[in-house]
Amino acid sequence: MSKTSGQTSQNATSAAQNVACAAQDAASAVDTIFTAPHLRWGVIGCGVIANQMAEALASVGRTIDGVANRTQEKAVAFAQRHHVKRVYDSIDDLLASDEIDAVYLTTPHNTHIIYLRKALQAGKHVLCEKSITLNSAELLEAEELARQNGVQLMDACTILHMPLYKELVSRVEAGEFGPVNLIQENFGSYKEFDMENRFFNPKLAGGALLDIGVYSLTLARLFLKSQPHDVLSMMNPAPTGVDQTDGILLRNAEGQMVVLALTLHSKQPKRAMISADKAFIEIMEYPRADIATITWTDDGKQEKVQVGRTANALAYVLADLEAAVAGDASAQAQLEVSKDVMELMTSLRNDWNFLYPEEQ
């Protein structure tokens, strides 16, 4: 055998081994992430996040059973791209199907309540992208519809589902770090001023608070003992009137404080700092974080905590809904956090006299 052919054979063997290892990793991920019985999933909406979800599921061996979109051509293209089993002629047809158990709702914020009503009344479990609704009243309505129809409603905000946060919250609640005193978070993205896109268009429920602030407030609420009752804030509007930059200060009955800085028109690190008596916890890129650094107060030593995988963020979201359907009480309780966060966001926008067209 020539040297070249021998190398080719070795390369082929190595490639085959890599494929086998990847398959084993995917199977292991499925076993680790999905512990409850699988549901048959339909996706409503075919935007960026829906495509990310489809890719995340494919990477761990799961598929989507159906898709529907207001534009049929987009649904067909989505199905072809992600090997979706069936394209429905309309969203109503998908919701009427007895071949779909649960839906992942990815349409713009201001349409969520429309499809939540339809899906929940159709007896479908719903995983709804953030921001789950526009305001507290809508979320309470959706919660009641879920209760009446015996189905689960869940917020897809990744903070609620990442294994890292479940681990850190458990350690905080066990008192390992002492009382949490202060939480500081930054979240900044630079978005060009396109007044027709979802970031700045009030007709698409644009603005920093509902788009990125929901992450910051959700993280903060996870580590607070109770809902903040003192709320101070300032907001700078974009030319369209939606909030472009927000500064938020919160305090609860226990004296725990939260300081948040949010902007859609300046880049800054997505950084969270949770400060307690015995240590502080730093988390970078926190919306889908899998790593945190703990610095101990007494000796300055650092501990790296790594739990889960950022790449599996959306798979964790879907797995939690399936766990809730199977009776997991902790997964079912996540909506309480979402309700507190929505209450805060509604209060903040009321303070700013900032209502969306649907609310006026």
Where are these regions (language model features)?
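Contiguous beta-strand/loop segments that form the cofactor/metal-binding neighborhood of enzyme cores
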Residues: 2-3, 218-289, 319-329, 359
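A contiguous active-site-proximal alpha/beta segment in oxidoreductase catalytic domains
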Residues: 133-192
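Beta-loop-alpha module in the N-terminal Rossmann-like domain of NAD(P)-dependent dehydrogenases
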Residues: 53, 85-145
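Hydrophobic residues in well-ordered beta-strands that form the structural core
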Residues: 88, 128, 153-155, 283
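N-terminal Rossmann-like dinucleotide-binding module
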Residues: 2-82, 358
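C-terminal helix-rich "cap/oligomerization" subdomain common to oxidoreductases
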Residues: 1-11, 18-35, 102-104, 253, ...
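Glycine-rich "substrate-gating" loop/helix at the edge of Rossmann-like oxidoreductase active sites
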Residues: 203-210, 235-239
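Oxidoreductase and adenylate-handling cofactor-binding alpha/beta cores
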Residues: 161-184, 210-235, 249-256
